Amino acid sequence: MAKQAAIEQDGTIIEALSNAMFRVELENGHVVTAHISGKMRMHYIKLLPGDKVKLEMSPYDLTKARITYRY
C-alpha cells in the first residue's frame, strides 16, 4: 500500500508551546498542534505568534502538523 500524500494548509500561529511546538489556527478555523520541520530548525528560523506559516498534515491524524515554511 502506498503512503497517502500530505495535506498542505496555510495558518497563523496563535501560541508558542514548549519543545518547539506551536498552536496554529488554519484558514478554515480549525486549531492544530504543530512542530517545526528539521530544515527550519537547522537554519534557526524563529517563529512568533502572529506569523503566517505553511503546514503539512497527515491524512491519518488531522490534529497534528509540521510547519514547513514561514511567510
UniProtKB/Swiss-Prot annotation:
Disulfide bonds: none annotated. GO terms for molecular function: ribosome binding; rRNA binding; translation initiation factor activity. Its main location: cytoplasm. It is found in: Cytoplasm. Keywords: Cytoplasm, Initiation factor, Protein biosynthesis, RNA-binding, rRNA-binding. Transmembrane segments: none annotated. InterPro entries: NA-bd_OB-fold, RNA-binding_domain_S1_IF1, TIF_IF1. Residues 1-71 form the S1-like domain. It comes from the Bacteria. One of its GO terms (cellular component) is cytosol. It holds the Pfam family eIF-1a. PANTHER family: TRANSLATION INITIATION FACTOR IF-1, CHLOROPLASTIC. One of the essential components for the initiation of protein synthesis. Stabilizes the binding of IF-2 and IF-3 on the 30S subunit to which N-formylmethionyl-tRNA(fMet) subsequently binds. Helps modulate mRNA selection, yielding the 30S pre-initiation complex (PIC). Upon addition of the 50S ribosomal subunit IF-1, IF-2 and IF-3 are released leaving the mature 70S translation initiation complex. Belongs to the IF-1 family. Component of the 30S ribosomal translation pre-initiation complex which assembles on the 30S ribosome in the order IF-2 and IF-3, IF-1 and N-formylmethionyl-tRNA(fMet); mRNA recruitment can occur at any time during PIC assembly. This is Translation initiation factor IF-1. It comes from Christiangramia forsetii (strain DSM 17595 / CGMCC 1.15422 / KT0803). The lineage of its organism: Bacteria, Pseudomonadati, Bacteroidota, Flavobacteriia, Flavobacteriales.
